[in-house]
């Protein structure tokens, strides 16, 4: 069914990483294989959404001083208050007008050619209190812990298992649920974000793509 969902902090950010982050890599954008291609300066999310990729976070899994093409890493604001501000750009990226390099060229090892990749991505903290996210929900789902999932490249269509979830009734957590799945499209989900809490958490992991498996971090606060 369709009802409000509150996604927990930390590894909950894997949903945005997979369903949105990959759409903002110029590896996809340059081939027009992303539904977010050619949308710089456009509103692509709700005003509650600010999405950041930061290769400079101290001690984070995805941080290095230089990318695999010899450029310093940086903090890149990808989406700011709903507006698409930047892509993650590797060396071929500047061949496309208006795409400055962002130190995003990455690869697993010398057997792979670098491509644009995420490092440490997070949904920036908002102003809402966690309890306020639940308060107005008559019936919904709390996805406290996310599991694995699948994403269709280009469109951002996704389905993710909820590893630990609970029914929300009249703003209160009730019985646990098993077998719940979150299904949707990344760009549509961006537009439907209602509120973001203040309790940002990050979680480490590995990300696989054309240039192999690389260490990353995903992060977010509680999100409605």
What kind of feature is each model-predicted range?
Residues 1-224:
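N-terminal small-residue-enriched
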């Amino acid at each position: 069914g369709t009802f409000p969902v509150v996604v927990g902090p930390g590894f909950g950010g894997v949903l945005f990483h997979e369903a949105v982050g990959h759409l903002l890599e110029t590896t996809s954008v340059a081939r027009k294989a992303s539904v977010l291609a050619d949308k710089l300066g456009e509103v692509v999310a709700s005003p509650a959404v600010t999405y950041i990729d930061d290769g400079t976070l101290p001690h984070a899994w995805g941080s290095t001083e230089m990318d695999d093409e010899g450029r310093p890493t940086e903090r890149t604001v990808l989406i700011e208050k709903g507006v698409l501000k930047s892509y993650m750009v590797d060396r071929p990226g500047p061949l496309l007008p208006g795409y400055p390099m962002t130190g995003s060229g990455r690869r697993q090892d010398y057997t792979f050619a670098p491509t644009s990749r995420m490092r440490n991505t997070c949904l920036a903290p908002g102003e809402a209190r966690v309890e306020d996210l639940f308060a107005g929900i008559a019936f919904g789902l709390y996805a406290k812990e996310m599991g694995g999932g699948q994403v269709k490249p280009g469109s951002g269509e996704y389905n993710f298992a909820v590893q630990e979830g609970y029914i929300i009734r009249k703003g209160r957590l009730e019985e646990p649920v098993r077998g719940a799945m979150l299904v949707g499209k990344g760009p549509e989900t961006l537009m439907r974000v209602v509120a973001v809490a203040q309790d940002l958490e990050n979680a480490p992991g590995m990300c696989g793509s054309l240039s192999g498996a690389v260490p990353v971090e995903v992060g977010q606060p509680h999100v409605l």
